[in-house]
Amino acid sequence: MFERLEAVEERYEKLNQLLMDPEVINDPKKLRDYSKEQSDLSETVQTYREYKSVRKQLDEAKAMLEEKLDPEMREMVKEEIDELEQKEEELVNKLKILLLPKDPNDEKNVIMEIRAAAGGEEAALFAGDLYRMYTRYAESQGWKTEVIEASPTGLGGYKEIIFTIIGKGAYSKLKYENGAHRVQRVPETESGGRIHTSTATVACLPEMEEIEVEINEKDIRVDTFASSGPGGQSVNTTMSAVRLTHIPTGIVVTCQDEKSQIKNKEKAMKVLRARIYDKYQQEARAEYDQTRKQAVGTGDRSERIRTYNFPQNRVTDHRIGLTIQKLDQVLDGNLDEIIEALILDDQSKKLEQANNEL
């Protein structure tokens, strides 16, 4: 591990020199690439330097114990050693996590798709609750949201809603939301007070750039039509709505949120790129999991990942066994406690796997 850390620090210093090179300064692409690489390495290098400082202090403190000290001073040195050893252990654990392979998509924007599943109108209302939960969470992080396509119902729910979340690191936090979300509550229309169970599915995809996903224009069929509102009524007499069909994969994307056909096509292409990338990633993951004989984890959208129980004001994430009695706060966008627990669990599993492969 420490050989890798030395190599990382050496590369960091090299990048510092390169970023002062006039040739690099005058080359926007190199400047951007080197700056990003330096930024990515910065936390690891600073933590490693802190570790080396603590290690040096620890060696000096232990050397002091070899000298003749009065009892009071010896006790003070022992206390300092205990504190430094605890700090050293914390820094080593942090460095192990920092050296784990990074998800190349973590810094990307997100395309999120929420669909009502089992439960009829109740499922559609729950899909609306989830949409509001994620938009409020995005606001708390300083991110922007933009609707791409929506199929609202008469009571304020959604059969389906697709939207982007724009902000640095959005995917790193929201990628754990993939899967089936279950709600348990008494519908307003239920006179007997019985609890109903409904579900909605969430797909969280990283937004991909054109250069990252090659799509041959010959493989896309473009259909245009007049956009429609709730209930199917026409709201636009121009052919502004766009449907894109990727013939090789059969993936279909529709967008009619904008008045302009050009803007609708741009939005639809963003979703299409993300879905094609996700399809290939899922196929690669499935092959990898089959090889390692592992069960499909959080990427399996048919898996029930979380339950929202209204009568008990309870949220349970079934993947990590986390239960919190703050449903009202969670639906208001306070997702930090759940997301941080999921990130920690993911890091722990990766650390265990890395240790097993040593």
From Swiss-Prot:
Q: Where in the cell is it found?
A: Cytoplasm
Matches recorded under InterPro entries:
PCRF, Pep_chain_release_fac_I, Pep_chain_release_fac_I_sf, Prokaryotic/Mito_RF, RF-1
Please report the PTM annotation for this entry.
Answer: Methylated by PrmC. Methylation increases the termination efficiency of RF1.
Q: Name one GO cellular component term.
A: cytoplasm
Entry GO MF terms? translation release factor activity, codon specific
- Alphabetical UniProt keywords: Cytoplasm, Methylation, Protein biosynthesis
Which residue ranges traverse the bilayer?
Answer: none
Which SUPFAM superfamilies does the UniProt entry name for this protein?
Release factor
Gene3D superfamilies on file: 3.30.160.20, 3.30.70.1660, 6.10.140.1950
Pfam families assigned to the protein according to its UniProt record, in alphabetical order: PCRF, RF-1
Q: What is this protein called?
A: Peptide chain release factor 1
Which organism encodes this protein? Geobacillus sp. (strain WCH70)
Name of the encoding gene: prfA
